[in-house]
């Protein structure tokens, strides 16, 4: 594909299993505008485990050196996109810079010269989005950037999201989202950045249930320090529980928590960010900012007296590693003490199920409290005539229990 793709408003495109959409990395026109996949109508990507849909670049360009090269734009669901399904789909090598001539700049979604494309963008507060069983990897910017809509984000693998900033999942005002059962490996900053930034009379409070996710190696690659697994701010109602953080730089942060319920300041004080499990390896990071926190080990970051830790409120019941008790989750196949904290290449041989006797199998929240029930577990979300349900809460930490 050497030109921009647009699904027109009022139309839909179905991409069947096994289809590969290969983007030209040279861009469009004399300005080399990164190729963008614009969804003004509806998009249904219907891959299978055996035959996923693929959005990528030419095979010879799928290299480690190009992990953050931003070889094409990304999928941009505009404010006229009513619904989108991304199931069993691989999206990789995205993150081209938004420039003059980029459709997203012309449409006012992003600003030319200031933004890079996430893998997936949404921008319709009335939209419905289901992103499941997919792989979002190797991108300059965020994996998913939600600026509107109802969404289920479940059972996905995120890897190497963000070159010098960015998150796996980034939520803004106008969204109601369940984020569950995902693996998030080496997001540049956070696995979850949750904010009600942009809230207005028409764009409502961001509401997020984030549970049973496994976040690994978050925060270490960032140029400077800002978060390191979960970051909740600006009046977001965020219930973040039963997640497993492994070798992340910091614990959950809630900046400006002394000024809650303010779209310009702190998160909603009705949020529950607790009952999480913070595991650490013994290895030292090869990137340490001595002039900032000086944190060089995951356990040190978890126990650092950070100004954005809302002590006594956040993580009161969480299980937190220390230097002398690293809380090894006992994964089936992941060397928690060996994989470099700044590693971003995902090994398909890893297995984040846990072995019998793993400490992540005890101490989690039952999830039965009314305020912790997923938004779309009962009635679900209807996309293309099919009802999709969020996963039920599991009384364990992380995405996977016993194999």
Residue ranges with predicted function:
Residues 1-8, 12-16, 24-41, 48, ...:
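Extracellular beta-rich repeat passengers
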């Amino acid at each position: 594909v050497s030109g921009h793709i647009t699904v027109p408003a009022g139309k839909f495109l179905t991409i069947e299993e096994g289809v590969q959409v290969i983007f030209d990395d040279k861009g469009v026109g004399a300005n080399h505008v990164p190729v963008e996949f614009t969804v003004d109508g509806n998009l249904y990507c219907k891959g299978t485990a055996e035959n996923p849909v693929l959005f990528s670049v030419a095979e010879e360009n799928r290299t480690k050196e190009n992990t953050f090269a931003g070889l094409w734009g990304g999928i941009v669901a505009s404010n006229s996109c009513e619904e989108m399904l991304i199931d069993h789909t691989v999206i990789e090598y995205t993150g081209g810079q938004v420039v003059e001539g980029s459709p997203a700049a012309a449409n006012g979604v992003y600003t030319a010269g200031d933004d890079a494309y996430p893998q997936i963008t949404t921008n319709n507060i009335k939209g419905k989005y289901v992103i499941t069983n997919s792989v979002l990897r190797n991108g300059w910017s965020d994996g998913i950037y939600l600026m509107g809509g109802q969404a289920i984000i479940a059972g996905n693998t995120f890897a190497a999201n963000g070159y010098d900033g960015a998150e796996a999942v980034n939520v803004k005002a106008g969204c109601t989202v369940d984020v569950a059962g995902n693996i998030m490996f080496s997001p540049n900053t956070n696995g979850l950045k949750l904010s009600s930034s942009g809230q207005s009379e028409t764009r409502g409070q961001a509401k997020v249930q984030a549970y049973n996710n496994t976040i690994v190696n978050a925060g270490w690659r960032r140029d400077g320090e800002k978060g390191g697994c979960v970051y909740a701010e600006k009046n977001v109602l965020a219930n973040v529980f039963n997640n497993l953080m492994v070798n992340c730089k910091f614990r959950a942060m809630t900046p400006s928590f002394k000024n809650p319920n303010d779209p310009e300041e702190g998160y909603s004080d009705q949020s529950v960010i607790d009952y999480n499990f913070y595991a650490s390896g013994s290895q030292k990071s090869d990137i340490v900012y001595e002039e900032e926190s000086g944190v060089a080990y995951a356990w040190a970051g978890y126990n650092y007296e950070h100004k954005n830790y809302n002590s006594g409120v956040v993580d009161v019941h969480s299980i937190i590693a220390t230097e002398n008790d690293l809380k090894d989750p006992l994964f089936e196949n992941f060397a928690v003490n060996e994989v470099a904290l700044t590693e971003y290449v995902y090994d398909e041989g890893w297995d984040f199920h846990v072995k019998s006797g793993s400490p992540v199998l005890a101490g989690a929240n039952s999830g039965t409290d009314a305020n912790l029930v997923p938004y779309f577990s009962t009635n679900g979300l209807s996309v293309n005539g099919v009802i999709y349900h969020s996963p039920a809460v599991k009384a364990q930490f992380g995405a996977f229990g016993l194999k």
